[in-house]
């Protein structure tokens, strides 16, 4: 069911009238506040109860200034509309400028108080409020600092685990490479041993071929005995030949075998 219409007339019951006054007064103050905030309007509300108690509201916390503005506007309203608008605009901007200057001054004082300046003129209550604000600020700062430190510690722990894993991988690779190098070294040693065993076996089977190969490596004698025999035969053939120059001179030169001593050759005859 919908709410029934209430007849607008004086409430005879004193208690009911007082309760209704409180409710309607609070609603009126709320509406005045909403009007000033939503519409950026200057609102002043003055209420007297049946017992003569004063209730007032002003969005700039100065009902008297609003009343003075009203008086000036009412005084200028009889002349023309344009001057009234100009006066109202000028008063509005002056009030707004004063508000802004006051807010700036308050903020500057607050900033100075936060760093410990100009606290000599503060009362005990204001000092307690300032102390409470500073403690709350320090608590928030410490909480944020601890949060950042915890995050940094977690990151460093993860980084440590990653570095340990990388170190393990590197050690594994180094061990594998050392094992491969050891295998190659063992294989080379085995191959050299096999070559030495094969050379020893070949020397036992054919010692003259091995000796000839060793002499050839040192460049002392020809490669094999067949070449040596051929050189001896060539020297013998030269001995059997007579050089014409030696015959004309009346002597013949004894050809020396390569490698023979110089003392074995006969002296020449003149």
Swiss-Prot record:
Subunit structure: May interact with MADS6, MADS7 and MADS8.
Segments forming domain MADS-box: 1-61
Protein name listed in UniProt: MADS-box transcription factor 13
Stretches assigned to the K-box domain: 90-180
Molecular function GO labels: DNA-binding transcription factor activity, RNA polymerase II-specific; protein dimerization activity; RNA polymerase II cis-regulatory region sequence-specific DNA binding
GO terms for biological process, alphabetical: indeterminate inflorescence morphogenesis; plant ovule development; positive regulation of transcription by RNA polymerase II; regulation of transcription by RNA polymerase II; specification of ovule identity
Species of the source: Oryza sativa subsp. japonica (Rice)
Keywords, sorted A to Z: DNA-binding, Nucleus, Transcription, Transcription regulation
Stored InterPro entries: MADS-box/MEF2_TF, MEF2-like_N, TF_Kbox, TF_MADSbox, TF_MADSbox_sf
Keyword Transcription: yes
Subcellular location: Nucleus
Known function: Probable transcription factor.
